[in-house]
Structures are given as C-alpha cells and as structure tokens.
A protein has these predicted regions:
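N-terminal export leaders
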Residues: 9-14
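Bacterial N-terminal signal peptides
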Residues: 15-26
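Intrinsically disordered, low-complexity segments enriched in small/polar residues
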Residues: 29-158
Length: 158
C-alpha cells in the first residue's frame, strides 16, 4: 500500500518513469540484455548538484525543492547518434505541444552529453524548468495537469 503524499510534496517529486522504460528501447524493441541508450539526470541549476534518484516499482524519482530551477542532463550512452523526444509535465520541451512519440526532439551525437534547462521559446529563449505546485505548473494552467511531475524521454536510434 502506498503511503499518502501531500499534493505539494508529490508535485515536487519529478518522476523519471518514462526514462527507465523508454531509454531501454533499442531499434523499436525493449530488451533486458542490452544497456539503455540514454542516461538522464536532473541537475539543480543554482548549485550544479545532480539530484539523487530513487527507484520504486519500475520508476525513478528525484525529490526537488519548491521554487528550485533544474536542468535535464541527457547523456548518449552509445557510439551512434540518437534522437531524444523530451517532455516535462507532459509537454514537449521543444514545441510546447502535449507530448507524443512522433514529435521533434534533440539529436545527440555519439557519447554526447547536454543539459536542457527549459522549454524552448525561441532559438535564444527558454522558460526554465522549476519545481512548483500542481496549480502553478504551466501544464495545469494550460489545461493539461495529468502528467505534472513526469519527465519523459523517448529515445530512438538514427
């Protein structure tokens, strides 16, 4: 039985659930014998600290402090290019559309690591990722609260 978690506390926990499943996709099929294509970490932007991850029931969780800004560190763990379709709170990090597999993503070169600090507003501007309450989240304010707290990454070989 799950212990109850207050709404603000739950909103402050970023779920990395999709990553543990989707990052293990290899050429369209998941296999337990192959290592994941992608490593994903949350990085607190002010301190540069990588947030701890805790696994439970096939998902990974990282506790965050309300109001803290964070970046998502994507590391390609292969010797080939991969496409990462990234979403935060169910919103595509590049387009701002409700997240889906066939959307625009980030192409990472072999062994490349990059930090994504927010939703892309233009080529020069972003809206920073920030731990906040459900009601203050961008997704909830735009009528899409179902996936608040979820960081998702669909990873595809080129």
């Amino acid at each position: 039985m799950r212990s109850p978690v207050s709404l603000p506390r739950r909103a402050a926990l970023c779920q990395l659930a999709a990553v543990s499943l989707l990052a293990s996709l290899h050429a369209g099929c998941a296999t337990a014998a192959m290592p994941p294509l992608l490593d994903l970490q949350l990085v607190e932007r002010d301190s540069g600290s990588v947030l701890a991850q805790y696994a439970s029931a096939g998902r990974r969780y990282s506790p965050g402090s309300p109001g803290a800004r964070y970046a998502i560190r994507l590391s390609n763990r292969t010797g080939e290019r991969v496409l990462v379709v990234l979403s935060v709170d169910g919103v595509n990090a590049i387009t701002g559309d409700t997240a889906g597999f066939g959307q625009t993503g980030y192409v990472l070169g072999p062994w490349e690591t990059t930090d994504i600090a927010g939703w892309r507003k233009s080529d020069e501007r972003i809206a920073a990722f920030e731990f906040t309450s459900l009601g203050d989240s961008y997704a909830a304010r735009t009528g899409r609260p179902a996936n608040v707290g979820v960081v998702g990454a669909a990873v595809f070989r080129e």
